[in-house]
């Protein structure tokens, strides 16, 4: 089960131009976003550790996204 709230995920789809969004579509996008987010976060943690830090910074996230 996805940890992301469903309502904001539905709004993302609506902001992309969909007049209506099914529950299945919201659930599917939430799952994909969560999987992508976990992958990016894991890479950001590696970058922070490599830099000798325990704290993940925004720059780590940005670098992880570019590396993906």
Curated annotation (Swiss-Prot):
InterPro entries: Archaeal_histone_HMF, CBFA_NFYB_domain, Histone-fold, HmfB-like. This is Archaeal histone A1. The keyword Nucleotidyltransferase does not apply. The lineage of its organism: Archaea, Methanobacteriati, Methanobacteriota, Methanomada group, Methanobacteria. It is found in: Cytoplasm; Chromosome. The record marks 14 as: Interaction with DNA. Its main location: cytoplasm. Keywords: Chromosome, Cytoplasm, DNA-binding. Pfam families: CBFD_NFYB_HMF (PF00808). GO terms for molecular function: DNA binding; protein heterodimerization activity. GO terms for cellular component: chromosome; cytoplasm. Homodimer or heterodimer with another histone. Dimers then assemble into higher oligomers, with the DNA wrapped around the protein core. It comes from the Archaea. Binds and compact DNA (95 to 150 base pairs) to form nucleosome-like structures that contain positive DNA supercoils. Increases the resistance of DNA to thermal denaturation (in vitro). Residues 20-22, 54-57 are annotated as: Interaction with DNA. Belongs to the archaeal histone HMF family.
């Amino acid at each position: 089960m996805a940890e992301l709230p469903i309502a904001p995920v539905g709004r993302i789809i609506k902001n992309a131009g969909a007049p209506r969004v099914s529950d299945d579509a919201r659930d599917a996008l939430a799952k994909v976003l969560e999987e992508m987010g976990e992958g990016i976060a894991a890479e950001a943690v590696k970058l922070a550790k490599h830099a000798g830090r325990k704290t993940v910074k925004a720059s780590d996230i940005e670098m992880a996204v570019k590396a993906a």
